[in-house]
Amino acid sequence: MANNIQALWQRQRDLSSGIPPIIQLCGPEIEDKIDIAQVVCHQFERRVSSLSCHRLPLNAEDLATFIRRWERESILEQRVLLLNCDDLDPTDQLLQTSLNQLLEEVKGLIIITCRTPFQGIRRQMIRFDVPKPHPQEQMMSWEASVAELKAQLNGQRNLVPEAEQLSQDLQGLTAQFQLSTSMIRRACTAAVGQLKTQSEPSLKQALWQSCRVQARPGLDELAERLESKLSWDDLVLPPLQQETLESISAHVRQRAKVYETWGFAAKNRRGLGIAALFAGPSGTGKTLAAGVLANELQLDLYKIELSSVVSKYIGETEKNLQRIFDAAESGGAILLFDEADSIFGKRSEVKDSKDRYANLEVSYLLQRMESYPGLAILTTNLQSSLDPAFLRRLRFVTQFALPDAAHRAQIWRRVFPPTAPTQGLAFERLAQLNTPGGNIRNIALNAAFIAADAGEPVQMKHILRATQTEYEKLGKSLTSVEVSGWVDEKVFV
């Protein structure tokens, strides 16, 4: 690409054909576009002057002065203007006017970086798309960067595995993370720092963690990152639901092998994303299950409240979703879309433009979930409110039911950490409390604080007080049947 741009400018200079065309570099990764621009300018023996479009004067007189000064400097110092328009707001008419004037009046060499094609300028513009690197290109970048990393490790070069194992490790990184060349370099640099401080250093783990960190900045601004230390042991579910979650995990881990190595993607490129629905009442473990998957897969988990993404303005919901998915793709994070009911209502007859656009919003979300190179999860408290036509496009649908007495007893047994002091807890009696796991965890935590404040181990009386507080918060009545025998001395065996 850099060679093509350089040849284009060279041909224009050789022909003395007047004002050179503006070069547009369109794509998601600003640093890759900057790298290309710098290579072009080096080949063309020009220096680069970078400028954010937001630094442009908005006053007409100031802008005219800026243009005159730039024209003089670009000629005297043989400079190319590299204009960063990646975060240009198309609705900012004042800035758009200044930008248009600059591009039309400056006669020298200009390169624009942008996410979407720039239009409406009365001057020739040639667009070059800068997509994210293909997996093979990413693999080459990884190999080159790891070779540099090995040189930096000095006496720790033994941390770099043999060629065959290293190739497998890098293929795993390429399959999970869609990083640009510059992000791969940064990940390797960060991994060196980790390896020098770890007591049991592992190059694979250091690179994996660095990749997760590289992808966070953009997504942290758009969604809530949930930290999770949960494991399969923290889940109490019926066997069928447990098996479904394990299948989801397998689909994420083996995605590259099945689609690329085994060739299933060649049959059909559609629907390669892993889209799931977790349905069930509040507190039944939907978010907890997502946390378990994230921890087991060593991936970040981001929670997005769909109610806050949906906009009353036509087209804005899709833009909000686009920003989230675009930011998430490089890191392969697990996306948890909460409150699916707010957008996935049953499809009704299209009577007006609002109905039509509402269906478009749903279709757009499903399309992005299906093409997302990772796991995207929807949650709902009421599956019956969702249109079956939409559900058919999801790969997994898992029901999270209210736990029965046996499952509640298991939850009570696991809810207290091994280091928490307890005394005389009757788990079968506690299981009489007809409440979901989320509320059980709240009660256990509150009981621990009550016991700690009293200087005692957690006992049934503390759990009773915590239960009364929890039920009052929920506006529920605590029946005598549910707490029967809780504070009877005969319970303490």
Cite the ranges covered by each PLM segment:
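Conserved phosphotransfer microenvironments
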Residues: 89-99
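Walker B catalytic carboxylates
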Residues: 83-84, 338
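Short acidic/histidine-rich motifs immediately flanking catalytic phosphotransfer sites
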Residues: 77-80
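AAA+ P-loop ATPase motor domain of ring mechanoenzymes
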Residues: 1-63, 69-72, 103-493
